C-alpha cells in the first residue's frame, strides 16, 4: 500500500490527533538520595492549600530579568531578517527581581542591580513588604536555599504560615505564571538600564488588571480533583480506514 503524506495527514486529523507543544515535566523518584513520591507530595500540598481562603495566599519568588526585553518573533518584509541592532553593553546585563503577589495584585517587589537573592536579602524583603503588614497569611515559596534559611522560616512563621512548593513542580507556585505575563509586556517597552527597567516594571504592574492576579492564583490553587474534558465542537467522529 502506497500512502502519501497528505492522506496520512487526513487520517491523523480525522481521528482527533493534533500537533501539540511538548512539555517536559521532571518527576524524579529520588531527591538528595531519599525516595520521594511526587503525586503524594502534590496531594499533601493541595490538602494544605484547602485550609486557607484564596484571599489569604501570598506567593513569593525571584526571577532573572534581562536588560534587553524583546520578543522572540517579530514582523518583517519577506526575504528580510528581523534584526535589532544594539551598541550599548547594557544589553548583556541581567538583574534579579523578587516579587510577592496576592489576588489583589503585587504586594511588594524589588530589582537588584548586582548579585542574586540570599537569606539576608530575603529577610529584608519580607520585613519591608510582608511580615510587618500581614497576619495569618499563607506564604508560598519554592525550595531555594535562601528560602529554607532558619531566619526566613522564623520570620514568616512568627505571624503567618509557610508552605513550600512541591519540588520540580513549578506550577505549585502560581507566581511563575505571573512572571510570564510580566515579561511579555516588558518586551513591548524600550529601555536598557537598571533605572529604565525599574520604571518599565512599575508602569507594567499598574497596567495589569486586578482580575489577572485572581485568575492566576485561582488557576493554580482551586484546581478540580479530576480533570473534566470540555465538549469540543470541532471533535470529529473517528473514521475506520482499515
Q: Residue ranges of each PLM-predicted region?
A:
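Conserved short alpha-helical interface segments
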Residues: 1-30, 56, 63-67
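C-terminal anion-handling pockets and recognition modules
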Residues: 5-7, 11, 54-55, 175-242
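Surface-exposed cleft-lining segments at the edges of enzyme active sites
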Residues: 25-33, 107-120, 135-138
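Extended, low-complexity cationic-aromatic segments
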Residues: 39-128, 228-237
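Acidic/histidine-rich, metal-coordinating catalytic segments
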Residues: 61, 135-148, 173
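RNase H-like polynucleotidyl transferase catalytic core
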Residues: 83-89, 157-174
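RNase H-like two-metal-ion nuclease catalytic core shared by retroviral integrases
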Residues: 141-143, 164-187
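Short, aromatic/basic amphipathic alpha-helical patches
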Residues: 149-159
Amino acid at each position: 500500500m502506497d500512502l502519501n503524506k497528505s492522506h496520512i495527514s487526513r487520517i491523523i486529523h480525522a481521528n482527533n490527533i493534533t500537533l501539540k507543544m511538548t512539555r517536559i515535566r521532571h518527576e524524579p523518584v529520588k531527591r538528595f538520595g531519599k525516595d520521594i513520591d511526587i503525586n503524594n507530595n502534590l496531594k499533601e500540598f493541595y490538602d494544605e492549600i484547602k485550609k486557607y481562603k484564596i484571599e489569604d495566599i501570598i506567593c513569593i519568588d525571584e526571577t532573572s530579568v534581562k536588560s534587553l526585553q524583546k520578543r522572540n518573533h517579530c514582523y518583517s518584509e519577506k526575504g528580510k531578517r528581523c534584526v535589532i541592532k544594539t551598541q550599548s553593553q547594557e544589553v548583556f546585563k541581567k538583574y534579579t527581581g523578587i516579587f510577592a503577589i496576592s489576588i489583589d495584585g503585587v504586594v511588594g517587589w524589588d530589582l537588584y542591580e548586582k548579585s542574586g537573592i540570599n537569606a539576608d536579602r530575603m529577610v529584608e524583603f519580607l520585613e519591608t513588604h510582608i511580615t510587618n503588614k500581614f497576619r495569618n497569611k499563607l506564604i508560598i515559596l519554592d525550595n531555594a536555599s535562601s528560602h529554607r534559611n532558619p531566619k526566613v522560616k522564623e520570620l514568616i512563621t512568627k505571624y503567618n504560615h509557610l508552605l513550600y512548593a512541591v519540588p520540580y513542580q513549578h506550577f505549585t507556585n502560581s507566581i511563575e505564571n505571573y512572571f510570564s505575563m510580566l515579561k511579555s509586556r516588558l518586551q513591548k517597552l524600550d529601555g536598557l538600564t537598571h533605572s529604565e527597567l525599574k520604571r518599565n516594571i512599575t508602569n507594567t504592574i499598574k497596567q495589569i488588571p486586578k482580575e489577572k492576579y485572581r485568575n492566576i492564583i485561582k488557576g493554580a490553587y482551586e484546581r478540580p480533583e479530576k480533570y473534566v474534558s470540555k465538549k469540543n465542537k470541532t471533535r470529529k467522529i473517528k473514521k475506520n480506514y482499515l
